[in-house]
C-alpha cells in the first residue's frame, strides 16, 4: 500500500475502555475498517464506525486487527485471522499454554505482533530489566516484581509483570517457570536463592504500575513504570498495526516495532 492512510485497521471489542481509545487512535493514523462488539454488550458502537457481526467478517475487511479482548477469544480469533490472511496485533493477557500455542501456529501463516504491553516506555523497561539481570548476580541480588492495577483486572500477575519476569530470567539464563514465586501465603520459609518473586495489588482506578526491585544486602535498585492513561497502550498498538504491513509471517514483539532488536 502506498500510504499509512490506506491501511484498514479493525478493532476487536471496539466499545470497551481500550476499544474506544483504539478507534480514536486508529482513525487518526489510518483507516478504521470497523469493529466487533462484545456479545451481550449494551455499549453502542462508536459513531460512524461499522459494527461487524463477528471476527470473521471483521478480519476479511481489515489489513490488521487490534485485539485487546479476552483470553477466551484467542483461539477463535486465531482461526479467523489465519483464514483471512490478516495481521494480528494482540495485547490480550492471561493466555493459557493452549492459547499461546494457537498464537505461535497462526504466526506461521500471518504476521502477529504479540506484546504484554504496547506502551513504548514499558518496552524500554523490559530491555533494561534483562541487561540489569545479566549484570546483577542472582546469588547477591534478589529480584522482586510488584504490580498494581484497577480493581476490575482479572488476571494476576499481569502480563507485563510476567514479561518483566521473563526478561530477568533471560538475563540470568534460566526459565521463569523454574524460579517463579508468586503471591507468598502464610509461613513459607526463607526466600529461595535465585527466585523471582511477584506481588500483585488491586484497587481503585490504577491503569498500571510495575516495579522491578533488585535487592542486595548493601543496596537496592528499583526500575518503575507508571501508566497514567490507556492511550499509551492504544498509540503503541496502532503503531504496531502500521509497522506490520508488508512484513512476512512471524511472531513479532513491540521490541521489533520500536527497532530495539
From Swiss-Prot:
Catalysed reactions, as listed in the record:
(S)-2,3,4,5-tetrahydrodipicolinate + NAD(+) + H2O = (2S,4S)-4-hydroxy-2,3,4,5-tetrahydrodipicolinate + NADH + H(+); (S)-2,3,4,5-tetrahydrodipicolinate + NADP(+) + H2O = (2S,4S)-4-hydroxy-2,3,4,5-tetrahydrodipicolinate + NADPH + H(+)
Keywords in alphabetical order, please: Amino-acid biosynthesis, Cytoplasm, Diaminopimelate biosynthesis, Lysine biosynthesis, NAD, NADP, Oxidoreductase
Give the enzyme's main class according to its UniProt record, as a single word: oxidoreductase
Entry annotation: catalytic residues? 149, 153
Q: Where in the cell is it found?
A: Cytoplasm
According to UniProt, this protein's pathway is: Amino-acid biosynthesis; L-lysine biosynthesis via DAP pathway; (S)-tetrahydrodipicolinate from L-aspartate: step 4/4
Q: Specify the domain of life of the species encoding this protein.
A: Bacteria
GO biological process, any: diaminopimelate biosynthetic process
Enumerate the residues binding (S)-2,3,4,5-tetrahydrodipicolinate: 150, 159-160
Gene3D superfamilies to which the protein is assigned, alphabetical: Dihydrodipicolinate Reductase, domain 2, NAD(P)-binding Rossmann-like Domain
NAD listed as a keyword: yes
MF terms (GO), sorted A to Z: 4-hydroxy-tetrahydrodipicolinate reductase; NAD binding; NADP binding; oxidoreductase activity, acting on CH or CH2 groups, NAD or NADP as acceptor
Query: Is Oxidoreductase one of the keywords?
Result: yes
Matching PROSITE patterns, A to Z? Answer: DAPB (PS01298)
The record describes the protein's role as: Catalyzes the conversion of 4-hydroxy-tetrahydrodipicolinate (HTPA) to tetrahydrodipicolinate.
Give the matching PANTHER family. 4-HYDROXY-TETRAHYDRODIPICOLINATE REDUCTASE 1, CHLOROPLASTIC-RELATED, DIHYDRODIPICOLINATE REDUCTASE
Q: Which family does it belong to?
A: Belongs to the DapB family.
Q: What name does this protein carry?
A: 4-hydroxy-tetrahydrodipicolinate reductase
Organism equals Granulibacter bethesdensis (strain ATCC BAA-1260 / CGDNIH1)
Amino acid at each position: 500500500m502506498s500510504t499509512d492512510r490506506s491501511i484498514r485497521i479493525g478493532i476487536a471489542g471496539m466499545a470497551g475502555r481500550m476499544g474506544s481509545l483504539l478507534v480514536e487512535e486508529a482513525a487518526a493514523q489510518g483507516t478504521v475498517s470497523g469493529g466487533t462488539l462484545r456479545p451481550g454488550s449494551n455499549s453502542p458502537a462508536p459513531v460512524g464506525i461499522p459494527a461487524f457481526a463477528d471476527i470473521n467478517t471483521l478480519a476479511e475487511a481489515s489489513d490488521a486487527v487490534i485485539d485487546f479482548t479476552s483470553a477466551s477469544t484467542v483461539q477463535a480469533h486465531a482461526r479467523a485471522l489465519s483464514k483471512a490472511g490478516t495481521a494480528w496485533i494482540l495485547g490480550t493477557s492471561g493466555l493459557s499454554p493452549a492459547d499461546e500455542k494457537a498464537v505461535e501456529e497462526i504466526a506461521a501463516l500471518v504476521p502477529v505482533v504479540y506484546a504484554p504491553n504496547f506502551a513504548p516506555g514499558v518496552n524500554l523497561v523490559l530491555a533494561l530489566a534483562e541487561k540489569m539481570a545479566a549484570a546483577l548476580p542472582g546469588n547477591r541480588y534478589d529480584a522482586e516484581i510488584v504490580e498494581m492495577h484497577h480493581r476490575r483486572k482479572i488476571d494476576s500477575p499481569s502480563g507485563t509483570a510476567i514479561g518483566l519476569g521473563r526478561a530477568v530470567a533471560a538475563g540470568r539464563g534460566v526459565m521463569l517457570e523454574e524460579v517463579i514465586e508468586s503471591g507468598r501465603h502464610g509461613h513459607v520459609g526463607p526466600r529461595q536463592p535465585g527466585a523471582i518473586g511477584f506481588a500483585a495489588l488491586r484497587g481503585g482506578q490504577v491503569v498500571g504500575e510495575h516495579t522491578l526491585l533488585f535487592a542486595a544486602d548493601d543496596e537496592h535498585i528499583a526500575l518503575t513504570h507508571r501508566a497514567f492513561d490507556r492511550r499509551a497502550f492504544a498509540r503503541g498498538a496502532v503503531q504496531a498495526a502500521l509497522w506490520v504491513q508488508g512484513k512476512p509471517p512471524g511472531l513479532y514483539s513491540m521490541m521489533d516495532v520500536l527497532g530495539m532488536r
